[in-house]
């Protein structure tokens, strides 16, 4: 757990100016909220924070925040990054108690190759994460969905999942997690018959071709396509 400790300093100044000066020092503004307490405004080292969540749990890593000589258990709940440099600019922490369940989003992954895929179907995930409740120390790394027996046209719903011990899924039981779709058939264009040299035009082709003898060219015809004379050109 030593690698999951974040040292923080309380900050009194708020706003864009103080935040900018803080980033110039290599720190970022942060806030801790939760447990029906007023938010606490902090500053933390972004490099230390990113290193601390380099675990299989990623953003659901349980962190220990050291502040004013005390320790808080927190989760890294939200963040902001610079749109150009992609550097971390702000962090939000949720304070938790080790004996109280917390609601988090956990990644969903599939395991196995479905029967439907072997038959040419396309496996799709309707969602890439599910929300569940668990104790902070019992949050799973991921939820695995076995799709081995899934046939074309079939789907797996939340009711068919077995959550890890101590976890409760917070989704409707009929919510679709994964399904195997019927492959789309490619439409093949019908071949066009080649024109036979010297053959008479099809009925109506003459009407669509050159104008009748003595008739004026239609608007937009060859006469209309001639480039206009340049301004000042000799006539």
UniProtKB/Swiss-Prot annotation:
A Gene Ontology annotation in the biological process aspect, one of them, is: translation
Which residues lie in Low complexity bias regions?
A: 210-222
Gene3D superfamilies given in the database record: Ribosomal protein L25, beta domain, Ribosomal Protein L25, Chain P
Recorded hits in Pfam families, A to Z, give: Ribosomal_L25p, Ribosomal_TL5_C
Q: Care to name a GO molecular-function term for this sequence?
A: 5S rRNA binding
Source domain of life is: Bacteria
Q: Which GO terms describe its cellular component?
A: cytosolic large ribosomal subunit
Keyword list (alphabetical) reads: Ribonucleoprotein, Ribosomal protein, RNA-binding, rRNA-binding
What are the start and end residues of every segment in region (Disordered)?
Answer: 1-21, 210-235
Question: Composition bias, kind Basic and acidic residues: at what positions?
Answer: 223-235
Subunit comment: Part of the 50S ribosomal subunit; part of the 5S rRNA/L5/L18/L25 subcomplex. Contacts the 5S rRNA. Binds to the 5S rRNA independently of L5 and L18.
Q: By its UniProt entry, which HAMAP family does this protein fall under?
A: Ribosomal_bL25_CTC (MF_01334)
Q: What is the documented function of this protein? A: This is one of the proteins that binds to the 5S RNA in the ribosome where it forms part of the central protuberance.
Q: Check the record and name the PANTHER family matching this protein.
A: RIBOSOMAL PROTEIN L25/GLN-TRNA SYNTHETASE, ANTI-CODON-BINDING DOMAIN-CONTAINING PROTEIN, RIBOSOMAL PROTEIN L25_GLN-TRNA SYNTHETASE, ANTI-CODON-BINDING DOMAIN-CONTAINING PROTEIN
Q: Which family does it belong to?
A: Belongs to the bacterial ribosomal protein bL25 family. CTC subfamily.
Q: What is this protein called?
A: Large ribosomal subunit protein bL25
């Amino acid at each position: 757990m030593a690698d999951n400790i974040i040292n923080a300093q309380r900050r009194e100044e708020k706003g864009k100016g103080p935040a900018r000066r803080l980033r110039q020092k290599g720190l970022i503004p942060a806030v801790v909220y939760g447990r029906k307490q007023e938010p606490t405004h902090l500053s933390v080292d972004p490099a230390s924070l990113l290193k601390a969540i380099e675990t299989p749990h990623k953003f659901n890593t349980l962190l220990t925040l050291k502040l004013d000589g005390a320790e808080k258990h927190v989760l890294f709940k939200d963040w902001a990054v610079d749109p150009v440099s992609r550097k971390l600019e702000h962090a939000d922490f949720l304070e938790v108690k080790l004996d109280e369940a917390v609601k988090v989003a956990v990644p969903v992954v599939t395991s196995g190759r479905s029967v439907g895929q072997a038959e040419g179907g396309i496996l799709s995930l309707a969602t890439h994460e599910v929300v569940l409740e668990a104790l902070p120390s019992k949050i799973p790394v991921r939820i695995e969905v076995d799709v081995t027996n899934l046939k074309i046209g079939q789907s797996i719903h939340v009711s068919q999942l077995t959550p890890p011990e101590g976890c409760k899924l917070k989704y409707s039981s009929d919510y679709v997690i994964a399904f195997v779709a019927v492959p789309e058939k490619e439409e093949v264009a019908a071949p066009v018959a080649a024109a036979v040299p010297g053959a008479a035009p099809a009925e109506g082709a003459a009407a669509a071709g050159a104008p009748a003898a003595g008739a004026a060219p239609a608007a937009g015809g060859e006469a209309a396509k001639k480039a206009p004379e340049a301004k000042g050109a000799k006539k």
